[in-house]
Structures are given as C-alpha cells and as structure tokens.
Amino acid sequence: MEVISIFGPKHGSLISLHSSYNLFKVSKVTRFRRTLFPSNHAKVFRFKALTCDNQESNNMFKELPTSEWTHHFHSIQVDVSEMDAIRIEIDALKPKVKNILMSFQGIDSTKKRILMIYMLISLGLACQFEEEIYETLKEGFGKIEEMMANEEDLYTVSIIFWVFRRYGHYISSDFFRRFKGNDGNFKKSLIGDAKGMLSFYEAANMATTKDYILDEALSFTSSHLESLAANGACPPHMSRRIRNALNASQHWNMEMLVAVEYISFYEKEKDHNEMLLKFSKLNFKFLQLQYLQELKVLTKWYKEVDFVSKLPPYFRDRIVENHFFIQTLFVESQHSRARIMMAKYFILLVIQDDTLDRYASLPEAESLVNSLNRWAPDHAMDKQPDYLKFVFKFILDTFEEFEKELRPEGGSFGVCATIEEFKSLVKANLEAEKWALADNMPSFEEYIEVTGVGITAMTTLMGAMMCMGKIVPKEDYKWLKSRPKIIQALAIKGRLMNDMKGYKEDMSRGYAANAVTCYMKQYRVTEQEALKEFEKMVAVANKTVNEEFLTTMGVSRLVLKLAMGVGLMISITYSEDEGYTHPEGKIKEKMTTLFVDQIPL
C-alpha cells in the first residue's frame, strides 16, 4: 500500500506566500489557551535569553514528560502484504453487504434499511457506503411522515431520528410525544426496554436549542439507564454498552472508538450477521494498519526536524497525539494525506502557542509576531535567540511545503487563507499575553468575548479545510471569515471547558483572569456554583452546534461536518482534565485501543 510521505524537513530558503484575497481581518483579542497542569514528572527550568533590547529575560516553564509514543511508532514495521490481503477480502465482501442494504423495498423496508445504516455507522462501515446511504435518506426523508405513522417501537423511532440528524436532515423531535402518557411524562412501560432506552438517550444527545422534549428525554433515560446497567437487569454486554454510552454518547465520541466497542457488543448478540461482523473487523484492521503507516511517516519527519536539539524543552511533544485527535476530523481511508498534513499543522499551532505562552519574553514574542505578520523577519529578529529564529523559520517552511503539495491541484487559495488566519492567531495570543501581564480583571462577558471568539476553533477548522485541498470551494472560506454562529458556539464550548479544567494552574502561573475567577467575582458565587453554570453553558453550546449543523445554508456539508469534528475534538480533549497537555489516563487508553490493541479476525 502507498502512504503519502510528503513534506520532508527541508529548511532551506524562505518564500513569501502572498494572498490576493484579503479575507481575514485581524479580530479582537481572542484566546483559547492550552492550560498546563502539574505533573509528578515535571521539571522546572529557568533559561536566560538575550532580548532585542540586549537585556536578559528569565524564562521559567515546567518541562512536561515527552511522549512515549514517538519512538514506538518510528520503529514499528507495517506488513504491506497483510494490508493487500485485507483489501482483497474487503473488496469481496463490500458488494455482498451492499446487496443486503439495497434489497429492501417499500415503507417498512425503508425503516429496515435505516436500521441497517445505523448498524453500519456503529460498526465503522458507513464510509464504505456513503452514496447508498445518501440516496436512502434522501428518498426516506420525503416519506418521513408516512414512515413514522403508527410506529410505536421506541428503538425504531429513536434510530430513525438519530440517523437522519446524523446526516443533516432536520427531523422533528415531536415524533417522541407518542411515548408520553396522559400525565405528560414518559410512559413507565419504556423503562424496562434497555435497547429502546439506550437509543432514546442517543437521540436526546442530538438535541437543538428548541428540542425541549429531548431535554426531558436525556434526564429520563440517563437515570434509568444507570439503574438498568447496575442492577443486573441486562446481559453483561448490554450493561457495558450502556455504561460506555453514559460516559460518552455516540454523537460525541470518535467513530472508530465507537466501532471497536460496537464490534465487541455485536459479536455477543445472538442474531448477529457473521458477514457484517467479519467485514467490520477487516475494515478496522485495515484502517489501523494505515494509521500506523501514517504515524511512521510523521514520526520520521518529526525526528528529522529535530525539535529536541533546536528548542529548549518548553514545548509539548505530541506528534502521535496529534494524529489521534485528528481522527475526529478525518477517519476515512482516502484522507491519509489530510491526516498527515493536519498533524503537522497542529505542530505549528502548538509550537507558536507554547513559545508565546510558556517561554518567550515579551520582546521576543513581539519580534516573532511582527515577523510572522510580514511573513519575513524583522530587524529585531536578527538579534533574537536561535530558538526563536528556528520557530519562525519552521513555521514559514512548513506552510511552504503545504503550498507546494496543494498548488498542482489548485489548493493554494486554502493555504493563503490559512496563513492569514494563522497571523490573526499569533497576534491575538500576543495581545492576550500583554493583557494578562497587565493584571486586569475583566467582566465575564468581556473575557468570553476577548478570549473565546473563534480562535482555536476557527484556526483548526481553517486548517482542516486547507488539508482537504481543492474540494473545499473558495466560498466556504468566505463563509468561515464571517465567524458564523457554529464557530462562536464551538469557541465558547472550548473556552469554558478549557478553563474549567485548568484555571487553578493558570492562577498558579500568574494569570488571574480566567472564566472561573471572572464569573465568581462578577456574580459573587462559589467555585462550584460557577462550574455548574459553565456545564449548563457548554450544554447550550452543544445544542447550538447541533442546530447550526442542521440549518446552516450556503456552505458545503463537508465543512459543516468538519465543524462538528472540531466540537468532538473539544469534547474528547477535555472529557477528563486537559487531554492534550496531559494525555495520560483516558487519552492513553483510547490511543492504545485505536493504534495498538488488535481485533482478532
């Protein structure tokens, strides 16, 4: 199999990439700080660097443990012949599964087809049948009223609702009113239906700001599912699936992690289809091997760039973790190049963030930002330390490599647009540092406006669009420039979840202004009261993201799907602590599942 081995570490002459499109104005100060957490293995370093004023500046930081993954995947061997053999088996099974999916006819058969689509999604096979799924849902949505008439099965109604919303069809939540009794509450007869209650819970996680009945459903299903899983009323494999869903709903979980769990669950179902089961295992195994190939390419590139010898140890060593988090954006086999590019793009984001936030003196930071704004070194850069010159050169060279890769297919526009957004990012980060040093405590609303409006959410989505190449039209970049509502909701979600996990460490580093402290001071509430309110705000942001995904017009579904992926990335990152800075624990478990653990074929 061929792996995209692009963008070698060629740090030669710099070129200037000028955009003929002035799409991105410099926004107000925006900040999506990656907070630092105490670590048992952290070491405190103090370095002295010569500033452009010929004054020494003390740089203190905590050295985080290096990633345990980089060396592992750099030395791993992938059996290409095994991939070829698996591909042959997949190609043989795919038409057989397609025949099953497309053989259903009529209204009831459309229901069965949608139920099978849900199974394909859960098994990680939906990407194999995108065209068939699209046609099925397009046809079925036109018959939705007829299809749902007289349907009293909670599982069926919930799955149909979930699948349509998954693919951007705004199906009404009023269909669930049939499951309420005369007292206005959900019928008690539903409680013992574990399969139906779980699907209803999953549907409730697709709620928009106007789906009030789904708010009731989420509370109703969550409490009863916990009891079902705990009291032994369900088979062990169903109890485990319920617990996994309560920890992370399918809507807010990574597709291939869901697939691993569902394959294990499905195998224990008495009525499982052996061919589907085998197909799903082969598909996961093939993708896993492809991911390992990509990681080998990335770790080779990372070692050749040689950050360790060229930078003080202030930066987060996370190239493999980058690839993991990118699974929220690109999971399909055909997006190998996009994953590799995006992992490198994340290195750019992290290096600039750690340099400005954790290490550089203010004069150094100003010189770096000024040079990046001009896309050429300023006079002060000549006097800066070697580490800063390396950071500047690395950023320009990497964007140059992106441009060289995408230019032949007409993707230069996306690179230029992303460069402009990157400039806005570093400017905003610099201004935020100045603001923090001024020891100013803003209002909560000002803090959210200044630090939340679209910086990492915006820059991440822009980079993902760039990595997709020419298939993303120019109009979508113009749409993103307008800071649409979905981006604002993602930014608020990320800002609040970030500060909820890291505000104590922010304060220990001298940053008094964060969402928690601003809210506590302004509204005179306790820490726990503030955190409880933030949880409510994050829930509203999630509903807004869901709503905008279903209702936004004038932009491709591809970009809206990428925006949903950014929201998922935020959820995964901050599900427990700050998973990017400290990927130990749950993130490590998930990475092991995706990259290391084997599914027996």
UniProtKB/Swiss-Prot annotation:
Predominantly expressed in siliques but also in stems. The keyword Lyase applies. Mg(2+) 3 binds at residues 498, 506. Its EC number is 4.2.3.-. Belongs to the terpene synthase family. Tpsa subfamily. Mg(2+) 2 binds at residues 353, 357. Transmembrane segments: none annotated. This is Terpenoid synthase 15. GO terms for biological process: diterpenoid biosynthetic process. It is found in: Cytoplasm. GO terms for cellular component: cytoplasm. Mg(2+) 1 binds at residues 353, 357. Binds 3 Mg(2+) or Mn(2+) ions per subunit. It is an enzyme of class 4 (lyase). Keywords: Cytoplasm, Lyase, Magnesium, Manganese, Metal-binding. Pfam families: Terpene_synth, Terpene_synth_C. One of its GO terms (molecular function) is terpene synthase activity. The Asp-Asp-Xaa-Xaa-Asp/Glu (DDXXD/E) motif is important for the catalytic activity, presumably through binding to Mg(2+). Its main location: cytoplasm.
